[in-house]
Amino acid sequence: MLDELDLHLSTITNRYGRPFQRKTINAYKFAGVALHNWMTESSIEGDFTTCDVTTLNRFFRWYYTKHDVPKSQDGKGGYTGGTNTLQRNLRPLFLYLAEEYDHPSPYDSPKLHRYTAPPLGKPKTLSEEFVSDVLKATGNGSPKVRDFQTVRDHAIIRVLTEGLRAEELLNLRVEDLDLAQRTMLVIPLKMDRNTVDARVIPLQPKTAKALARYLRVRATHSMADATPFLWLGMRGRGALQYRGLYVLVKKRAKDAGYDPAQVAPHSFCHTWADDLKAAGVSGEHIMAIRGWKSPAMLRRYGADMASTRAVNAVQGLGDRY
C-alpha cells in the first residue's frame, strides 16, 4: 500500500497546487513504515485498512512513550513534537485509504488522541564575536589561504551570514551568482528553476570576494564540471550534502574555540535577521529578501534579541526632555 501511496502522491498536487517533493513523499512513507513495524511487533494482523481509532491511539501512545518522553527536559514527558509530526505525516495514507478502499479515516473521529506541536522557543542568535572568530578560523578571506577546503568553508560561512537556509545554500548553482552586481539568485525550495518567485539576495562585499576566490579553487576540483551545484564536497565527491554542511559548521565552531553544540547552520538565519533589524532595515525589506509571506516569521527570527534591540533603539534617542 505504501508503494500505491507513493504513486498516488507522485501524480497529484499539494494544497498549494504544486507537485509533492520527493522528500515529502518519503516522510509520509516513513510514517507508514513505522506504523507497519509497530503492527508487526504488536501481532496485529491485516493491512492498514484494519487500523481503527483505537489501534491508532495505541500506536501514537507507544510512539510518544518510546520517542518523545526521553526527549523531554525532565525525562518524564511533555514533549510531543515527534508524535505530532508522525500524526501529520500519516494523514495522507488514511486519506488515500478512504478514497481508494472506502476505509473510514480515523482522523475524522473526535476520539482520536491528538498530540499538539510543542511551542516554538527562541532560537539563540550568534554573537558578533562568534561569527568573527569562525571567519578567522577559515582564513578570514586572506589571499594567502588557497587550499580548497579552507577557501570553500570561508565562502560558505560568509553566505550563511546572508540569511540563507541550509537547503537554499546547498541548492545554489554556479549560474545563480552575479558577483559583478554582488547578488545571488535563490530558487524557492518547492519550485522549479523557471519560477518567477526566485529571490535576489544582496551580498556583502566580503561575501562576493569570498565567492570569487572559491570559484577559482572550485575550477581545480575533480568534480567541477560534473555537477552544476556551487558547493563541492571533499575527496573527489560531488555536490556537498546537508550532513557535510552540518559537520563543517560544527568543526569550524570548534576550531574557533566554541562549543559546537551551540551552533547549527540555521543559527545564522536568526543572526542575519537580528543584524538587519538592529541596523534599522524595514520589516518589509527583510520579508522580501527572506521570502516570508507572514509577519509572524519576522517576529520569530531574532526574537531572543528583541529586548536588546528595543533598549538600544530607545537609548539612541538620548534625552527627550
What are these regions (language model features)?
Residues 160-181, 284-288:
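Short, charged phosphate-coordinating catalytic segments
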Residues 192-213, 226-249:
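C-terminal catalytic core of Y-nucleophile DNA break-rejoin enzymes
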